[in-house]
Design a protein with these regions (language model features):
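Conserved phosphotransfer cores of two-component systems
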Residues: 134
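Conserved nucleotide-cofactor-binding alpha/beta core module
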Residues: 149-151
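Surface-exposed amphipathic alpha-helical tracts and adjacent flexible/coil segments at the periphery
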Residues: 2-9, 13-47, 52-59, 78, ...
Length: 498
């Protein structure tokens, strides 16, 4: 999809949360690009508004441990995407060692024969090999190539690259400068998902600690683990060692200045011990916040969709090939509305920020799009994803012909009396659950948890294709119950797009 703004536009004085177009200027929607770790994720992403998805073969992409795609499923995914008028990109962005070069063309040839819309690549050697063997194959430059300036983008344009996925470490102003200097190159920008504290994911922590190389797709997310902290000191040779009981009282503390110039200097040196690996110690420094040493918050840039659209960015990308189909559906739904509103010239809908709060996350940040103090990037509270707004509790698999009730595959426990949200591609309904039946149509009060199946009443005129069920955790959630009215009474009051 090509997305450009008509000439002579400047957005330097426009707010990030609004869209304003001048006469004779037409905004074209950027592509909404969603992650696909599985065929199911792909299908939900498309149902909720994604224009394209990206997926990879495990051996050659950076998602080896959580990737359900094989040659057979890639073929199915590409065929289904094209049947819907959507696009499917195949990721091939590892930093390959010599051992993988000999088999690469043999392994990628059947994938290219499936006619994906592009390969996402980062290594110049692999790019050269594909260019020589398959000169007509479109190539997008992966974020792993660290394109952070317009000269780099121009270089790759001369190599025949059709699109550059810009590094996450860029500000809005830097992205706009690149757009102005290379107006005829397609640009792609990450707008949502996990961030890495290393430069665009080029990290060795997992490889150092677990012999799992992140640059070969086997990252174990060691940066997000929980660590015990023990007192340390610098010895006479400059090594960091455990502080002994004998010299603890006389050892001078090591004052550590925060690298970003914010916060209180730390008076201590520590040794970190991962709880699952007792006895293996790693030196580190700590300030007043805690010991999550490289645990980034998650990127959320929905409030900047308007400005990125004005710049003429071609594709807005969501990270998350290891996430659930619910994650793919919710993020696609929210960013679809943000893009459509931007193109229509509507102001930013701040409720979209709240919709993304319902996803499990590690805290949100704007990343580098705007500059912040260091605590705005780092998560000091937890190493896993959580949400205190909503919980994904089930997926709708069918409608019972006899009762008209929705048949739910339960993922997490919920009960009669709970505030629920039915999420569908056409809109969302919030209600209080008044009744629940088991598979034998016996009345029950709670769905026990994953592996169970229950039936609940749903208005008959609501399409249940790709519908998901969420439990609201906020006590203040407004629960207008559609079941107190006739089944057809799904009104703007109780059905709204997220």
């Amino acid at each position: 999809m090509t997305s450009k703004l008509s000439p002579n536009r400047s957005s330097s004085n426009l707010r990030e949360d609004s869209v304003s177009t001048l006469p004779n200027q037409t905004l074209i929607a950027p592509e909404l690009l969603a992650p696909a770790g599985s065929l199911r994720n792909m299908r939900y992403a498309f149902a909720y508004g994604a224009d394209a998805v990206y997926a990879g073969q495990p051996r050659y992409s950076l998602r080896v441990r959580n990737n359900e795609f094989s040659l057979e499923s890639l073929a199915i995914g590409i065929e289904e995407a094209h049947a819907l008028g959507k696009k499917f990109y195949v990721v091939s962005n590892i930093a390959p060692h010599n051992s993988k070069l000999g088999t690469y063309l043999k392994d990628i040839s059947p994938v290219i024969a499936m006619k994906p819309d592009a390969l996402i690549m980062s290594d110049p050697g692999l790019i050269m090999m594909v260019r020589d063997a398959f000169p007509e194959m479109p190539i997008h430059l992966s974020v792993q190539a660290n394109a952070v300036n317009y000269a780099t983008v121009k270089f790759w344009q001369k190599q025949g690259i059709e699109r550059v996925i810009l590094s996450r470490e860029l500000s809005l102003e830097e992205i706009e400068t690149i757009r102005e200097h290379v107006p005829d190159m397609e640009l792609e920008v990450f707008v949502h998902g996990a961030l890495c504290m290393a430069y665009s994911g080029r990290c060795l922590l997992s490889g150092y600690m677990n012999k799992r190389d992140p640059n070969q797709g086997t990252c174990t997310n060691a940066c997000r683990w929980s660590y015990d902290v023990k007192a340390g000191e610098e010895n006479e040779t400059g090594d960091i060692v455990l502080t002994s009981e004998i010299n603890k009282a006389v050892t001078a503390p090591q004052v550590v200045i925060p690298t970003l110039g914010e916060g209180t200097p730390s008076p201590k040196v520590f040794m970190l011990e991962e709880k699952e690996k007792p006895g293996e110690l790693m030196p580190a420094f700590e300030d007043e916040h805690g010991t999550y040493i490289m645990n980034s918050k998650d990127l959320r840039a929905v409030q900047h969709v308007g400005r990125l659209t004005q710049m003429g960015v071609h594709s807005l990308k969501i990270e998350g090939r290891t996430k659930s189909h619910y994650y793919c559906a919710r993020t696609a739904q929210v960013y679809r509305k943000a893009i459509d509103d931007a193109v229509a010239g509507k102001p930013f809908d701040s409720t979209l920020m709240g919709s993304l709060e319902t996803l499990a996350h590690r805290g949100y940040t704007e990343g580098f799009l705007r500059r912040h103090a260091h605590h705005a990037y780092q998560n000091y509270e937890y190493g896993h994803s959580v949400s205190d707004k909503q919980q994904f509790v089930g997926e709708v698999i069918d409608r019972c012909e006899e009762s008209g009730y929705a048949i739910i595959n339960v993922k997490n426990k919920f009960c009669v009396g709970d505030s629920l949200e039915l999420m569908t591609p056409s809109g969302n309904i919030t209600f209080t659950l008044n009744e629940m039946l088991d598979k034998r149509n016996h009345s029950i009060t709670d769905a026990k948890g994953s592996g169970h199946q229950v039936r609940i009443p749903i208005p008959s005129d609501v399409s249940l294709n790709f519908a998901l069920l969420l439990r609201n955790l906020d006590e203040g959630v407004d629960t207008r119950n559609p079941f107190r009215k006739a089944p057809s009474a799904v009104t703007p009051e109780n059905a709204s797009e997220a």
